Amino acid sequence: CYLSEDHMLGARENLRLLARMNRLSPHPCLQDRKDFGLPQEMVEGNQLQKDQAISVLHEMLQQCFNLFYTEHSSAAWNTTLLEQLCTGLQQQLEDLDACLGQVMEEKDSDMGRMGPILTVKKYFQGIHVYLKEKEYSDCAWEIIRMEMMRALSSSTTLQKRLRKMGGDLNSL
């Protein structure tokens, strides 16, 4: 399983698209900021094993895609940029699907992956609750856009770490 340079370029392009989606000055929205508990240490640190790292990366990208591929999201953002972001996230997910399939075949049990995956799901659940509580306001979406930039930046760090291991996820 190999993460190509195109995969890494796609990750950087997704971050650029999120930056371009900025519609508001963040200053009026600062009172709406919240700590969503990004599992940054888990994602950026060295504590994940190969199967966990691939699973966490896939889950983060899937949850980010799910967040932006909604009716509420399409009402909040420039449609062209949003479609490009969703397409980019989908491409990254497809790249990872083969890796995830290999990992799942190699392991009889997915119990080792469940803890980190549940942490990621809990993080995104908090984001969905926040958006609903804030009634999907423009400020709430701006806070989430900035948060997703942090999350995708962290996931890019994990992807770089996976590639540094010779580009071969099996060498982790």
Curated annotation (Swiss-Prot):
Return one GO MF term: hormone activity
**Glycan attachment residues as annotated in the record:** 78
Where does this chain mainly localize? Answer: secreted
Q: Pfam families recorded for this chain? A: Interferon
InterPro entries attached here? 4_helix_cytokine-like_core (IPR009079), Interferon_alpha/beta/delta (IPR000471)
Phenotype when changing residue 6 to N: In IFN-tau2B and IFN-tau2C
Report the locations given in the UniProt record. Answer: Secreted
| Keywords assigned by UniProt, alphabetized | Antiviral defense, Cytokine, Disulfide bond, Glycoprotein, Hormone, Pregnancy, Secreted
Q: What else is known?
A: IFN-tau genes are intronless. They evolved from IFN-omega genes in the ruminantia suborder and have continued to duplicate independently in different lineages of the ruminantia. They code for proteins very similar in sequence but with different biological potency and pattern of expression.
Matches recorded under PANTHER family: INTERFERON OMEGA-1, TYPE I INTERFERON
Its family remark reads: Belongs to the alpha/beta interferon family. IFN-alphaII subfamily.
Function in brief: Paracrine hormone primarily responsible for maternal recognition of pregnancy. Interacts with endometrial receptors, probably type I interferon receptors, and blocks estrogen receptor expression, preventing the estrogen-induced increase in oxytocin receptor expression in the endometrium. This results in the suppression of the pulsatile endometrial release of the luteolytic hormone prostaglandin F2-alpha, hindering the regression of the corpus luteum (luteolysis) and therefore a return to ovarian cyclicity.
Protein name from the UniProt record: Interferon tau-2
